[in-house]
Amino acid sequence: MCDTLVATPDYTKSRTMILAKNSDREPNEAQSVVRYPRTRQKQKGLKATFIQIPQVKETYEVILSKPFQMWGAEMGVNEHGVAIGNEAVFTKITPPKKNDGLTGMDMLRLALERSKSATAALECITELLAEFGQDACGGYENKDMFYFNSYIIADAKEAWGLETVDRHWVAEKVKGF
């Protein structure tokens, strides 16, 4: 399993927010570190990993660490200092396995491209979850790697833990570590 951690300013010597994440993807799956600049979008839609969704008029600059073949990302930060890491969540609820939803990594990238704060990113992910769901294979060679997602979302002032299953979610503001 991947791990993401956050320490809020009250718990760090430097009095700054710290978010850290590792990746445990498949051995033959390379990670790409990429930067996408702020862009005024001309197209009305975008193709995420598996599905087409509406595009917003402007996307914020992002730096992402992502599996090379995926549209979305495991972790990243945007020009407003919003940082997000995501994890696979395996539950007793089985995804339909139809590839007709977003990946958790798609939602992470979309939230960074569209949000000026951690709270706005939380709202973006939960709205995407409600509208498009998360039924999409997250594996590279393993084409049966369907899972739900959890996230740690932070900016300089606040951090959130977000757990999801299917289209359901629960969030809690992080205070401390």
List each language-model region with its residue ranges.
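A contiguous strand-loop segment
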Residues: 1-104, 124-177
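Second-shell loop/turn segments in exported
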Residues: 96, 107-114
